[in-house]
Amino acid sequence: ESNPMLEISPRDLDADCFLLCTPEATYDLRKGMAGAREHSANDFITKITSVSPGIKGQQLWLDNLSLIFQKDQQLIDYVQMICGLAAIGKVYVEALIIAYGDGRNGKSTFWNAISHVLGLYSGNISADTLTVGCRRNIKPEMAEVKGKRLLIAAEMQEGARLNDSTVKQLCSTDEVFAEKKYKDPFSFKPCHTLVLYTNHLPRVSASDDGIWRRLIVIPFGAKIEGKTDIKNYSEYLYENA
């Protein structure tokens, strides 16, 4: 039951970046699995994941990682660290994570599965928003970024050049300026990890060191064919891993 006489500031909502709300419990990620506690309205959380933590299907997920990353355990550990950071509402990696490789290598399957698991904590942004070729007003799209912990852009056009200014704004801890349609402009502190999965590496300004240090390329070199190629595999992983 709501009480119109009680008001809170929007900045009080989802204010604790380490709290992760799941269907079964709210987790304080500083304490790991031991940080589980009952849901509380006093946490002012507005988002929730699609699933709760558990070990069911763990081996299926590990086998999938081994296939996609060709048994490169160092790479697997790094990618899992990135996914863990994406569950926290704080920018730890001021970079654009580029998942790169030819088709049929599992990159879209992997990131779509992670996005599905994170539920309302995850969002999408058009890949062309990150390029110099984007001529539209991107502030309404920026407005949808607020509060997301994982932000995914998919499939950049071949030969597209990154917009240094936009990438720097989305890959930093500085305030992001946005504007919903027919609403007043506002700013917010970003809390997301930004991932671009693509078959084509974007072009980058050769003279701007600031943009180069914000790019991390994760190779997806596997070729998944035959029996290992399952339609809608991201959904299968979501349901079973």
Located regions from the model:
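Catalytic nucleotidyl-transfer cores of nucleotide-processing enzymes
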Residues: 15-18, 22-24, 190-205
